[in-house]
């Protein structure tokens, strides 16, 4: 489920924001929801399909570091890299963009109608966002929670040895 529009109730994946990376210049940006598979890079204007990758060879620092993370020994297993403050995720989308997108997609005209819509669907939105973040930003079941990442770096100094059990259900 996704808070983007009412089809989230049917289980469709309609994310309000999608992180894209241009395969030509490696410019990363966030785009709004679109059914289109073709994208145009805002930096170099290159047109590409979502998920395309170009290997620029060993001279490209981004291409050569795709399979290793500077601060994450489990990057090859699909774990997200960790930020300097211990978080493994962030969101740079504007709240205004999200609000306007939700209003447009749900055909909401008045502020009062939007307030009622949020009150009636708030739990669904929070759960959908949490599921989306965990689905796209976690790795092994033992370490797939933000508390686990936090504990790893604050209590175990980033050392994976003897750190088999993380409680992600608190």
Curated annotation (Swiss-Prot):
It is found in: Virion. Keywords: Virion. It comes from the Viruses. One of its GO terms (cellular component) is virion component. This is Uncharacterized protein L485.
């Amino acid at each position: 489920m996704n808070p983007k529009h009412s089809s989230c109730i049917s289980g469709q994946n309609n994310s309000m924001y999608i992180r894209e990376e241009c395969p030509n210049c490696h410019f990363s940006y966030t785009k709004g929801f679109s059914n289109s598979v073709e994208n145009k890079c805002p930096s170099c204007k290159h047109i590409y399909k979502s998920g395309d990758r170009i290997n620029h060879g060993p001279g490209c620092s981004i291409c050569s570091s795709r399979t290793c993370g500077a601060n994450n020994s489990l990057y090859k297993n699909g774990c997200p890299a960790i930020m300097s403050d211990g978080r493994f995720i962030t969101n740079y989308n504007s709240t205004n963009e999200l609000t306007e997108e939700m209003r447009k997609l749900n055909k909401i005209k008045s502020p009062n109608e939007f307030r009622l819509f949020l009150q009636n669907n708030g739990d669904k939105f929070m759960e959908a966002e949490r599921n989306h973040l965990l689905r796209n930003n976690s790795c092994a079941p033992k370490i797939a929670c933000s508390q686990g990442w936090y504990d790893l770096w604050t209590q175990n100094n980033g050392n994976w040895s003897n750190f088999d059990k993380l409680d992600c259900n608190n």
